[in-house]
Design a protein with these regions (language model features):
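Long lumenal/extracellular ectodomains of secretory and single-pass membrane proteins
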Residues: 1-342, 352-517
């Protein structure tokens, strides 16, 4: 880009939040905009196409890695629809990126057991162009041959989940039937009957949950069910297999809470769950939730991966959670999740999982801030209900949080080592106008300087349900991090990174994504 265009971009970047605080239209990096905002296209996944084109003009390889990060179900954000729309756009522009398609269901290390996505992601990418289609058919054809060979040899545990995610040919959806037809015509199968026979055999061998439920067969080993299946069908399990399902959760709870030993390897899979998946039923259903459901949600919460385990030392993290009116915006088109549910779940996660002096403590804010403490011994239900009883109003007064924190610190003469090392602000970033009309970073740093304290690392965690909202900071602001999405993680990188852009490049150029090019 020319120097003139660069200058215009910077000069024309100023804006204000919906509540009047100075902010920015862009981070001044289109790839960073995609990295931090990609998830917010969940409401309108097609809208990500323009963002991908803009990012690709800046750095196409980094854009590719960013899309895989957004899709990554293990280390990234797990955004399925956004990835598919974005990847279709990128493959249309750069068909040579087809060489990375095999990594979607396989991961970059076949032995890692950590794919970026699922086999149906490949199916969703059909139709971009002939080149890409041929690559997809080739990948599926090869895996299908491997799976059938494993089935014939009786090596059931070596069969992939390909058959589960391929479309059925006898479904009621015309579009799905047409996709299935394209597949069997290009996979070397004779006809629809052959395709159905192959899928049936492989699905039966891999014990697909949905087939067993449709046959009213509840002889599950609940410890082996996929994370989304046990969450999605929990009411069916409670209704149709109540005694066994409840006994399973009772035993698991004793293991997780009391550390009791049991003969069987009892566990619950949570790899595919967001923290909000577990918190949302409590916020929405409230007092009518069953005791078994409370127990399951508590077990799932306790079993979520602890991303703080990778951090060195007992760093003092403090979560500041926005509970203002705009946080009740809903992501997606099917009432999937509200920003408030994302924020509360992430705030509680940070409060619970970090081991610093602010463990089990957090702040919520809207019109005025509320200091909240929870107890490890409480159930998830009790913790969420306790947080929900805090003061929630329409305002987004971030300044009030730092007025309260720093005034209290000065009056009590709190030593610097007992102040937060990193503050995680989880919000849609639509802050109220503040004193002297400064942007949020200027406001926060000014208050710390006036109080005589060093400003902590500031993590702005975007939980907005809307794409293209204003940004609180730009890419080069040292001592700050800009994150977005529903899944926690990467706390070691947060502490190490110097700026929003360096945080992103540390992740996208790291071992997990550097293989993509």
């Amino acid at each position: 880009m020319s120097s003139l265009f660069d200058a215009v971009t910077v000069v024309d970047n100023n804006t204000v939040t919906e509540n009047g605080m100075p902010a920015y239209k862009s981070t001044l990096s289109k790839v960073l905009d995609l990295f931090t905002d990609g998830f917010s296209y969940r409401r309108n996944p097609k809208g990500v196409e323009h963002a991908v084109r803009e990012a690709a003009l800046e750095n196409k390889e980094l854009t590719l890695r960013c899309l895989f990060y957004l899709r990554d179900i293990h280390e990234g954000q797990g955004e399925r629809a956004v990835f598919r729309h974005g990847m279709r756009t990128l493959l249309g522009l750069y068909p040579e990126f087809k060489r990375n398609l095999i990594f979607i269901p396989a991961g970059h290390d076949a032995d890692s057991g950590k794919p970026y996505g699922r086999w149906d992601d490949l199916v969703a990418l059909l139709g971009v162009n002939k080149e890409v289609d041929e690559e997809i058919y080739s990948i599926i054809r090869a895996q299908l041959a491997i799976d059938m060979a494993m089935l014939e040899d009786g090596m059931i545990n070596k069969i992939s989940l390909l058959a589960k995610w391929l479309p059925s040919a006898n479904t009621s959806s015309k579009k799905t039937r047409e996709t299935a037809k394209k597949l069997y015509q290009n996979l070397g199968l004779k006809d629809e009957r052959s395709y159905r026979k192959v899928l049936s055999a492989l699905r039966a061998a891999t014990n697909v949950v949905e087939i067993k439920i449709s046959n009213k067969d509840y002889s599950f080993d609940y410890s082996k069910l996929p994370s989304r299946a046990i969450h999605k069908y929990r009411k069916a399990f409670e209704r149709n297999d109540n005694a066994r399902f409840t006994a399973y959760h009772d035993t698991l709870h004793k293991v997780l809470v009391r550390g009791e030993k049991c003969i069987a390897d009892v566990k619950i899979n949570t790899a595919g769950l967001y923290p909000y998946d577990v918190v949302k039923p409590i916020l929405r259903v409230g007092n009518s939730i069953s005791e078994t459901s409370k127990l399951q949600l508590d077990n799932q919460w306790r079993s979520l991966r602890n991303y703080f385990e990778g951090t060195s030392g007992n760093h003092s993290w403090l979560a500041v959670v926005d509970t203002s009116g705009s946080m009740f915006d809903v992501w997606g088109t099917d009432n999937q999740v509200a920003s408030i549910e994302v924020a509360i779940s992430l705030g509680l996660y940070v409060a619970e999982r970090n081991n610093g002096i602010f463990k089990n403590q957090m702040i919520t804010f809207s019109q005025r801030p509320t200091f909240i403490t929870v107890d490890d011994k409480w159930s998830l239900y009790d913790k969420v209900k306790h947080i929900a009883n805090a003061n929630w109003a329409m305002n987004t007064d971030l300044e009030a949080v730092f007025n309260l924190v720093l005034n209290a610190a000065v009056k009590a003469n709190i030593p610097a080592e007992e102040m937060p090392e990193a503050i995680v602000i989880i919000s849609d970033m639509q802050f109220d106008q503040c004193t002297y009309n400064r942007d949020c970073l200027g406001m926060i740093r000014g208050k710390y300087e006036a109080a005589g304290y060093k400003c902590p690392k500031l993590v702005f965690w975007n939980a907005s349900a809307r794409a293209n909202c204003s940004k609180p900071i730009t890419r080069d602001k040292t001592g700050t991090i800009l994150v977005g999405g529903c899944k926690p993680g990467m706390f070691e990188q947060v502490l190490a990174a110097k700026s929003p852009e360096s945080f992103m490049t540390d992740i996208l150029n790291g071992e997990r994504y550097s293989v993509l090019n």
